[in-house]
Amino acid sequence: AVDIEYDFPFGFKELEGIHSRTDYDLKRHQEFSGKKMLYFDPDIQDSYIPYVVETSVGLDRTFLAVLSYGYTEETLSDGSTRVVLKIPDFLAPIKVAILPLVKKDGMNDYALNIFNDLKKYYLCQYDEKDSIGRRYRRQDAIGTPYCITVDGQTLEDNTVTIRERDSMLQDRIPVDNIRKYLHDKLNVI
């Protein structure tokens, strides 16, 4: 028997067990069922009871390993702590969040239009509660790779800010280019 283990924050735990059962299980099944468990190998022109390798893997611990690996606490220049779930884009439950800077002057309506377009292509979330900084932090903590911010400049020139989760870098792009931008950036299956 061999175990594949992962070093969790609370110590090494098994992710998968691999056991060589040889031909024991099939021989016992053959003995008690009366059914032949033979395999005919055309290359050697002979029949035999094959060996079995039994593997057991749990999705719960595997997923916990992904979350443990991705969970990060960063100290920012202002001394605050940022919790980030740095998981691959294809595992992120939400791919992009659409955030109006404020809930007035038509920014929320503009943002909802973007949300309604993007939700056809990506798992999206619309959020207008709290300050933009708190909304960014919420999205960082759940692993959302990109946040789109609709602000006053958006209403003037039809551009938005797209913020990347891991680096916090921001790009200003035309609204018409959002889908292409996300398609090029997101590593989704």
What are these language model-derived features?
Residues 1-189:
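NTP/phosphate- and nucleic-acid-binding module
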